[in-house]
Amino acid sequence: MPRIQPKQLSEIPELAPIFQAGEQLMGFVANDGLTMAYRPDILKAFLALVQSIYADGKVENELKRLIGLICSAAAGCEYCQAHAANSAEKYGANFEKIQAVWEFRTSDLFTARE
C-alpha cells in the first residue's frame, strides 16, 4: 500500500500526453508517474530525463535496461527492479542473462562490451 495514493488518469486529463508517452516507452502506465502527477513540473522533468536516457544512441536498449536493473538493485528498489527486469526482457535479454546480471564480468552470457 503506497503512502501517497497515485492519481487516477481520469483525474488528470491535462497530463494524458505525458502518460501516453510513458506508456509507449515502457509498455505500461507506471504508478510512480501517477504519484508524481501531484507535481506536474516534476513529472514533466522526469519524463524528459527518461526519454533522454532511453533515446537511440550508442548503447543498446537491452544494455540500458540491464544497467537499470543493477542500479535498481543497488538502490534497494524492488519496484524498479521488477520493471527493469521486465523491460530488459522486452528489449532482448533472456531470463538467464537477467538472472546472471551481477556476473556480467565473468559470465559467458555477456560480451566484453557489456
Predicted regions and their residues:
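Amphipathic alpha-helical segments within well-ordered protein domains
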Residues: G33-L34, V50-Q51, G68, A85-N86, ...
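Alpha-helical scaffolds flanking conserved acidic
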Residues: E60-I67
